[in-house]
A protein has these predicted regions:
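Entry/N-cap segments of selected transmembrane alpha helices
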Residues: 40-49, 132-148
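Small-residue-rich segments of transmembrane alpha-helices in multi-pass membrane proteins
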Residues: 46-53, 82, 105-122
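Juxtamembrane transmembrane-helix termini in multi-pass membrane transport proteins
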Residues: 4-54
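Juxtamembrane helix-boundary/capping and inter-helix hinge elements in multi-pass membrane proteins
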Residues: 27-39, 103, 128-136, 160-165
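Membrane helix-loop-helix hairpins that form the core translocation module of multi-pass transporters
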Residues: 38-89
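Interfacial loop-to-helix junctions that mark the boundaries of transmembrane helices
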Residues: 2-10, 64-75, 130-143
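Transmembrane alpha-helical segments of integral membrane proteins
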Residues: 22-28, 147-164
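Small-residue-enriched transmembrane helix starts and helix-helix packing motifs
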Residues: 1-15, 92-112
Length: 166
């Protein structure tokens, strides 16, 4: 696997892991109609893509020059944030994300930020930005997000069909 585009796609797709993401989105899969669920995912993906492309473009210099922190510090802080989100899931259950929003436009932001945009995916976008020219990095980011959305919507449709049968 020497192609930098394929390696970048594999890295980003492995971090997104739509099968694991479906567990985080289970309350939305169960509670929203397919059309609303799809709209929320697309909006969340567009928010995420914008953030990832900015980090692919700015890279580590953004952390060093503008935020004045080392990139490793960001990753540690991101891990702490995920620990807190995980604890909220443990104590609140699948309704932890539902409590953060009440309408579909707010859902897109809450799907993007704690689920899609995290220290691992931001780190991956920085790596992709160093491997590829910006248009190529943007194509990989959009392609990976599009595939993730398609897989999640297909899983939602399958869930709804199985739910109707049983």
């Amino acid at each position: 696997m020497e192609d930098p585009y394929l390696r970048s796609f594999a890295l980003f797709f492995a971090l997104f892991n739509p099968f694991l993401m479906s567990i985080y989105l289970l309350d939305l899969i169960r509670g929203l109609p397919t059309q609303v669920f799809s709209r929320v995912l697309v909006r969340g993906s567009l928010i995420s893509a914008t953030v990832f492309i900015l980090f692919a473009w700015g890279g580590e210099a953004f952390f060093r020059d503008y935020l004045q922190v080392r990139f490793a510090s960001f990753q540690i802080f991101g891990g702490i944030i995920f620990l807190l989100i995980g604890l909220r899931y443990v104590f609140s259950g699948a309704h932890a994300i539902t409590a953060m929003r009440d309408n579909p436009s707010a859902m897109a932001g809450s799907v993007a930020m704690p689920i899609m945009i995290g220290p691992g995916t931001v780190s991956a976008s920085v790596v992709i930005g160093t491997r590829l020219p910006l248009p190529g990095a943007a194509a990989v980011i959009f392609g990976t997000l599009a595939l993730t959305v398609v897989i999640l919507v297909v899983m939602k449709v399958l869930h709804d069909r199985l739910k109707q049968r049983h």
